[in-house]
Every structure is written in structure tokens, then in C-alpha cells.
Amino acid sequence: MNALTSWTQFFKNIPIALIVFVFLYSGIFTKEYETNTLILILTKGLSRYKVVFAKFFVMFTMWTIGYLLCFAVTYGYNAFFWDNSIAVGLLPAMVHWWLFGVWIIGLIVLFSVLVKSYTGVLLGTGGSVLGVYLISFFPKAWKYTPTTLMESASLLIGTKSIEDYGIAVLITILLVVICLIVSITVMNRKQL
């Protein structure tokens, strides 16, 4: 066993953490709909777009802190027992998975605004990821999908280069922005 094996395992385990994250935060709006606490906040003068940004920011912050903590523990563990220099594309691979998580957060916010049920948010988020994942099976579409970022562990061993993921990174950032814009637009018109 070496640091490369440990990092490969780290990137295989991140999807589990992301699934748990989705289950924890899919109710971020739906609980407010059920208890009508969102109406109280809005009647006190808080803008709807600020509510959307606040919810996104909370999830973004929790994902970033949790992810960086897991990364730091793994990095320290590998530095203590082995040499991290064997993993050549470690930083880009880490950023790609983090960005993939940010896209998931954008989807959670979008579906939380679109539907009023926890199950609907889970199905919408999971269905979107599954749909994009299936699209990535087409060789010509692979480099354009956010799910490409899940395969960035191949950067560790040098079978792919950072340039192979450039378009996917830009499209993922664009999709996060689109999710937020659509969420704010729908939230501004939504009857609560």
C-alpha cells in the first residue's frame, strides 16, 4: 500500500459522503414549506433572493468545510505514512470533486424551490445526476458533463491531464450559476 492507493480510496469514498450530504440538506426548504416559517421570514422584509442565497451559502460552507477537513486528514495521514508526491494531480482532482459537490448543492437549491417535498428534491437531484451521468457514456459528450469531474482520480496516476477536464469545469460552474438564477426567478414568482 502507498499514498496513491490511499488517495484512490479517498476519491472512491467521497460519493458516499456526498450522498449523505444530499440526504441531510434536501429538506432545507421543504421543512420551511411544511412549517410555514418561510412566510414569517419573508413577511418581516427579507428578500426572497436573499433566502435562496443564504440557503445556498450555508450548504456551500458546510460542504467546503467538511470536504477540506476530510482532505486534510487524508493528506496528513498519507504524509505521515507515505509520500504524497506520488499523486501527481492531487490538487486538481480535489478541486474537481469539490466543484462537483457545489453543482449538487445548486441542484438541491433548484429542486427545493421547484417542489415542496423532500422526496421530490431527492428524486430531482438524483435524477439529474443520473441523467447527466448516462449522457457522459457517449464518448463525444463525456468532456462536457459535470459527472466527468467524478473521474478526476485518473489525474493522480497521470492517465488524464488537467486540460481534459477544462470544459467540464466551465460547464459545471455555468450550471451552478444557472441553477441559482432559475431558483431565484422561481422563488420570486412562487406562491407560498
Region spans (language model):
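Membrane-interface elements of multi-pass transporters and channels
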Residues: 32, 76-84, 114-118, 134, ...
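Alpha-helix N-cap/start motif
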Residues: 48-49
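Transmembrane helix boundary and interhelical loop/hinge segments in multi-pass membrane proteins
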Residues: 24-42, 192
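Alpha-helix N-cap and coil->helix boundary residues
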Residues: 33, 37, 68, 122-123, ...
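Terminal transmembrane helical anchor/hairpin motif
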Residues: 1-8, 126-192
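Secretory targeting signals
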Residues: 1-28, 52-119, 125, 154-173
